[in-house]
Design a protein with these regions (language model features):
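Structural signature of extracellular appendage/secretion-system components
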Residues: 1-569
């Protein structure tokens, strides 16, 4: 009788545990399509055994069991796969962002209201060819003015579109920083919730853990992170090598906004002092004004070998660049500041191309020479012996591309002689630069095209201008950047800009595709462990239902047997 009644415990435990397993399986099935949900797995173990007598040398131990119990409902994850996935997901975010920005810049360069930017260069060259046939013809002169205005308009439009895109990227940077801070706050709150729930050692905070792990996965796509969980279930996170989620708080990322451009630079407010500025990314160049202000001269240095090509936020900073690109960034000493900054580098290239065309044409219409005064001072002056003049025959001649509010020459008396001294560009005065935004077609020529320097000083047509223009236009003396080894002319320079963008885009796309495939493969491995398979859960449901039915039949048999025994007594 004792064994019979004890068997009720065994059957009862079977019913309870099968029911619990069915509930867990049903919960898995209900969340089969829930993002971030981790499969729950019931683990069953023996209950305590009752020892009937102590074993001796001649007898075995006699024990009777009380059935089984649910020892744990496992929250199945693989920390090694999690770590690998988060790193590769960060790399995917980095290269996908670079590819996206490069593709957009290509679109800006090649299409403007249905017309390729290159057409404006070709049309300007055709206008100069027509002009060379008869430089005194007002129709040809007017064509030069029109095509020059069109060329500058398209240059300025492309440059402006790139600036607008930089502003768009800048807003994306702010949005991502805000999201990172929001994620950090949520992870910190979930840490406290998990600690509170699991402090008794009885329950696992599965829903909170799922939410936290999903947030960490998302965070890994924005920046390089390190996540470490302690024995209490609390996760501490480092972001770009600095403490982000700590024991008592989440350290928010701050943003420094530059005057003029409005560009944001992420930094760590909690460790930044008046003596030391701590940017979030130590491997991305800072805006020049900020770098000078805080005494930090870091440059962009990112490579897979350095394990720092991680995170879409860094890719946005690299793509946007630290400021607006200008022609002077194409020099050997400054090129490192725009290299790999796709928007800023393209701006610098367009500015450099426009400047070289403007300078070449101005130097033909208004050639300069040098004069050394008696006191040893050397001046750059108008070459009056070889320059052309307009129909009015006056000096100095009018340049084609003029700086707004800044004349090309100033008349001076040197050593008792009259000279037209060239007003050179100076670093102290930005308006003195021949650069996009500062330059327009000379308004005097636009108002009266016959003032274009097309005549020799004896009043005859200067047909020699055609050879000078052809030589300047076809001269192959431009490099796309200091690392380029083959020279090109003006039209070839534009082709190299597009080729350079296309090459970088192909590299970024290949890297993006590779990282996407790698991250997907690791995620598939994770899902095999933590994901919910409806087929597998249906199989488990049938198994646990069968176990429930078996336990029910077992209890029925024991009950009938007990009833029969009682009746016989």
């Amino acid at each position: 009788m004792a064994n019979g009644f004890g068997s009720f415990y065994i059957g009862s435990s079977g019913l309870k545990n099968s029911q619990n397993a069915l509930n867990t399986t049903a919960n898995n099935m209900a969340n089969v399509n829930t993002t971030g949900y981790v499969r729950q797995q019931v683990r069953v173990s023996d209950k305590h055994y009752i020892t009937r007598n102590n074993p001796t040398a001649g007898t075995n131990i006699q024990q009777s069991g009380l059935g089984v119990s649910v020892s744990d409902v496992a929250h199945v994850r693989d920390i090694f796969l999690d770590k690998s996935y988060r790193q590769e997901n960060g790399r995917k975010g980095f290269y996908s962002t670079l590819y996206s920005t490069t593709s957009y810049v290509e679109d800006i360069m090649q299409e403007m209201n249905g017309a390729e930017f290159k057409e404006s260069i070709s049309e300007l060259w055709q206008a100069f060819q027509e002009y060379g046939k008869d430089p005194t013809n007002s129709t040809n002169q007017n064509l030069i003015i029109q095509k020059s205005e069109l060329f500058l308009t398209r240059c300025n439009t492309v440059y402006s579109d790139l600036q607008k895109y930089q502003s768009n990227i800048n807003l994306q940077i702010k949005d991502q920083v805000d999201r990172i801070n929001e994620i950090g706050d949520k992870i910190y709150a979930l840490n406290l919730e998990i600690q509170k729930t699991e402090s008794g050692g009885v329950e696992t905070a599965m829903t909170a853990r799922d939410a936290r792990d999903s947030l960490i996965d998302e965070l890994a796509g924005y920046a390089k992170i390190e996540a470490e969980e302690d024995s209490t279930g609390y996760v501490r996170i480092k972001l770009e090598g600095q403490q982000f989620v700590q024991d008592n708080k989440c350290n928010h990322i701050g943003l420094t906004e530059e005057k003029g451009t409005g560009f944001y630079t992420p930094y760590w407010p909690h460790i930044t002092t008046q003596e030391s500025y701590m940017p979030v990314f130590s491997d991305v160049a800072l805006p020049s004004a900020l770098a000078e202000r805080v005494g930090c001269t870091q440059t962009t240095n990112i490579a897979t070998s350095l394990n720092n090509d991680i995170g879409s936020l860094k890719a946005l900073l690299v793509s946007r660049g630290s400021e607006y690109g200008t022609y002077d960034f194409m020099s050997e000493e400054n090129y490192s500041r725009v290299e790999d900054n796709v928007v800023m580098e393209t701006q610098a290239e367009i500015s450099y191309l426009a400047r070289n065309i403007m300078m070449a044409m101005n130097d033909i219409f208004c050639p300069n020479t040098t004069y050394t005064a008696a006191d040893g001072t050397t001046y750059t002056v108008l070459d009056t012996a070889n320059c052309s003049v307009g129909a009015d025959g006056s000096l100095p001649p009018h340049e084609l591309f003029a700086r707004e509010g800044y004349d090309r020459y100033t008349q001076m008396e040197i050593d008792g002689k009259q000279f037209y001294v060239y007003n050179d560009e100076t670093k102290a005065n930005n308006s003195s630069w021949y650069k996009l935004g500062n330059v327009s077609v000379n308004p005097k020529l636009a108002a009266q095209v016959t003032l274009m320097p097309s005549y020799k000083q004896d009043g005859s047509a200067n047909y020699g201008l055609a050879d000078q223009i052809t030589k300047a236009w076809s001269a192959e003396n431009l490099y796309i950047n200091p690392k380029d080894t083959s020279k090109c002319n003006f039209e070839g320079y534009y082709d190299k800009i597009i080729s350079h963008l296309g090459t970088n885009g192909s590299i970024y796309k290949a890297s993006s595709d590779t990282m996407t495939s790698t991250a997907a493969a690791i995620d598939n491995q994770r899902n095999q462990i933590m994901g919910v398979s409806s087929d597998e859960e249906l199989t488990n449901m049938i198994k646990y239902q069968s176990a429930y039915n078996a336990s029910s039949r077992f209890i029925t048999v024991i009950s009938q047997m007990t009833e029969l025994i009682v009746q016989l007594i």
